[in-house]
Amino acid sequence: MDKNLLIAFKEYSALKHKQPYFYSIESSGQVLYYFGAEHKKDPRHPQFELLQEKWKEFLQKTFGGKSIVVFEGSVNINKETTLDEAIQKYGESGAIVFMGEKAHIVSTRPEPTIKDEADRLLREFSRDEIFYFYIVRGVVSWQRSLVRKEFDEFVRQNIKRYKEALEWSDFDFSFETVKKVHQQIFGKKFDLDDRDFISKIPNPTYDESRINEIARMSSTIRNMAILDCIESYWQKGYSIFVVYGASHAVMQEPAIKSLMSQEVSAKIAS
């Protein structure tokens, strides 16, 4: 795989594409399906019908072979969970992990740990900025949820998660830090009701502040980890069903499709 083909954000920002965004490759009995989703947690959203159609198609093409699901984020479902419940809690990732479990296909999350990613981000950004990015990114996800905890409870759990993962000494892991950084960057108080503005803050395709730069660096780190995972399983003979956000799908497409050209080159060389 030629990872240099990963599309840069400057180039990506000039592109227009559908959501969801889907493509596939097939070679020598292996299949790779990439479903680039719109981040939604409403089971009635039409993308989930399309996702189920593509999943059934994938199962038919790969019956009897080695397969794996590659998904975004953290998902924790049990045997009592329904598809609708999985979507309401985890969106498209919950849907594909649920369907994978029903088909007895293993799912994997290929991303670096929070600490590993943060250590790389610290080369260019402050702890305040990185913590703010992580918490506000979580707030945006919370705002998209149809079924959600009370905000104070969500924030408490999210802050606890990052405090345990980051292990920073002498750092104020609190929402007061988020409010302070927000005021410093934007010159105004944090307003939970200003949803449109908040949604842009951790979005890598915007240029509102340095936090968007963190988002871009984070996304690039994650993209490389995803490509490494896909390449590894492909070389081991697995068929792969990937479900990630549409931007990841679009940006990774040239690199993923280079798997095919490399196989052709290898056959010619042999």
Predicted features and spans:
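N- or domain-start disorder-to-order transition segments that initiate the globular core
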Residues: 1-31
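Short beta-alpha junction loops
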Residues: 72-78, 111-116, 246-248
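C-terminal structured interaction module
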Residues: 239-270
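Short coil/turn segments at beta-strand junctions that form active-site/ligand-binding loops
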Residues: 30, 65-67, 236-240
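Beta-strand elements within well-structured catalytic alpha/beta cores of enzymes
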Residues: 35-37, 68, 72, 239-244
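Acidic/histidine-rich helix-loop elements
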Residues: 32-51
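Membrane-embedded segments
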Residues: 45-63
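Hydrophobic, often amphipathic alpha-helical segments used for membrane interaction and targeting
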Residues: 80-235, 255
